[in-house]
Amino acid sequence: MVNLTSTELERYRRQIILPGFGQEAQQRLKSATVLVTGVGGLGGTAALYLAIAGVGRLILVRGGELRLDDMNRQILMSDDWVGKPRVFKAKKRLEDINPDVEVEAIFDYVTPDNVDSLIQSADVALDCAHNFGERDLLNAACVRWRKPMVEAAMDGMDAYLTTIIPGVTPCLSCLFPEKPEWDRRGFGVLGAVSGTLACLTALEAMKLITGFSQPLSSELLTMNLHQLTFAKRRSYRDRNCPVCGTHSQHYPHPQQLSRVLVNSQ
């Protein structure tokens, strides 16, 4: 396991002293690579909290330029960057905030051509993509390569969060065999709502990496931020799921040799 420098020991001291966390959990964070798809109010904020927590390597994937109407929730962006690729600004900001973190910026969307290489490069994936086309690609690739994925999405004042562990929990296709009605661009959102969900998303990733606490395993967390109500419901695998079911072409994959950084017990 990688060693921590004296600077890192001081930088992360307040989380290292958490009961049950310690230096070993911090070393696991430093050793980890996390893929973040979507660098918006959700993905960008989650990436920020992973960077300041000491995750060793982040892979950011997002095509498209920053728009002015993104700015109510883009805490890594600045006004002078409107019209430019947001993923490069995010990389620069994260490296400025924590120079010990390696950040790779990929100016592209998740596609059938790149999804497998992206997933194979990471230990954990954060699904913060802005449409279900990309989400479905990520889900299938994570199932193929046995990589855990934190799944987070929101619509207005509602949000959901779950952690997908291939072979253990339901996959995204089990949970949403049909596209939810909120799968559309241009929905209204408050920055504080996306930020709330982003923090929980980053926390789930840290749980997976460190084993410090139990992630949402086979549970779907739903949030109504109008009323500040949170509910968890049990979720179940669908044996007939086209992605992770018994006869799926995606699972099991003959090359599923990648390690999963999770204590699923």
UniProtKB/Swiss-Prot annotation:
Belongs to the HesA/MoeB/ThiF family. GO terms for cellular component: cytoplasm. One of its GO terms (biological process) is nitrogen fixation. One of its GO terms (molecular function) is ubiquitin-like modifier activating enzyme activity. SUPFAM superfamilies: Activating enzymes of the ubiquitin-like proteins. It comes from Trichormus variabilis (strain ATCC 29413 / PCC 7937). Keywords: Nitrogen fixation. This is Protein HesA, vegetative. InterPro entries: ThiF/MoeB/HesA, ThiF_NAD_FAD-bd, Ubiquitin-activating_enz. It comes from the Bacteria.
